[in-house]
Amino acid sequence: MDYQDTDECEPIHTSEGTWNVLLAHVNLKKKTKASQASGVYTLIEMVSKDVLAVIKKLDDAGFEVAIVGGAVRGLISGEKVSDWDLTTSARPEQILKLFPSSFYNNRFGTVGVKLTEKVVEITTYRKEQKYSDSRHPDIVVWGETLEEDLARRDFTTNAMALRFAQGKLSKISILNSQLSNFDLVDPYDGQKDLKAKLIRTVGDANQRFGEDALRLLRAVRIANDLGFEIEPSTRKAIGDNAVSIKKISGERIRDEIFKIIDSKNCDKGILLLRDVGLLAQILPELDVCFDVPQKSPKRHHVFDVGTHCVMSLANCPSKKTVVRFATLLHDIGKAKVASVTDEGVRTFYNHEVVGSRQVRDIAKRLSLSKTDREKLFRLVRWHQFSVDERQTDRALRRFIRNAELENVEDMMDLRVGDRLGGGLQQPESWRLKLFRQRLKEVLKKPFTVADLKVSGNDVMKILGISPGPKVGEVLKKLFEEVVDDNKKNNKEYLLKKIASFK
């Protein structure tokens, strides 16, 4: 849904008193039945009906409840909110009693309540505590007030809450949500930073990052997502504490990196990671590439290797995260093999081989799945494929076998990013277009083990063996012969070949 600010405003009750906040009311370009007469929507009218039902149930039971985090930021900014987080005075066991189908599998007071399509997370008020591992509090202590809970949060724009006046929800119809009795609680001037487009920590930045080192990455990711700047003292603290990101698990780091890679401003996000000193800690193999120039005679590249990798990512048409990641990393091997000839030409021989080994290490470090590890490896290892129009069908089949059939289109997307990220104007050369067409033609011919004129039964019968790995090994060898010479895919020849394995 598309929102825009309205020129009208009405009082909003906050913990500081009554403010006239323009952003508290938004004018929807796309009208719905509610408030269609005026076209003006209050914050409460933008809250999901399912979420309101959860809030009402907690309120009816006598508990304080508030919307917190990014949802409040989104509501104030007039954005569509899809992820809802609530905080409450109710303890986890009390929440579970109210919502029997909910789940609670952590020690940090967060209960997941299933809605129609999503899950709303409800967290009990908590107090600040010591974080020895830079990730989790040593002990969890329940708080008594919303203000205590907001004091422990990461950034000012996430430390705002939409608190509902207790006992005022009983008369509300969830189907026609009209409500003005709420407090926009903003003790750390989150609205001010939101308007100024700044990411700033709540309180002392070094303390906040010391409590949870993942916040270092989150600051960059949120700033990148929103198009915000990081406030100077917060930015300095990120650099000062960058090394502590290594205390965070590979899975958590991966998730934040992937969100940046998939974002609209992915290139700016990666460069921001480098500028604040985080890239050197999480992807040092890429960070060193910014010091490796490529411009030289007989080379089309105009960027250093690191900038080229980032620009390639920005121009990669694929929506697959692992393909975009491979595009970002495709040339990291160049930093290790860079050389200059006597004529001044820069060379990077076998960088794809070296780079493929590096991405195996990166994939392991970031706990990628086995499938993603293999795809990442193959895309980097074989990204230097030739599109020479004089190649034989046999050479094309070899390329497909090396890259693997399911990766062929992904390899094309990487090449498009590679070309545009190198300063070329066209996503595809005529040779690449011809290469694509020839691949399609080659793929129309028999190309899998299932296309062989013999089967596993033939192998077992001739060799007198039972089902097992040996059958697959023989079929694979036969397939490799047929790939190189399609004329050999006839039953008589293949049966004789099977017999030769006795």
Predicted regions and their residues:
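Catalytic cores of the polymerase beta-like nucleotidyltransferase superfamily
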Residues: 2-3, 7-9, 15, 19-502
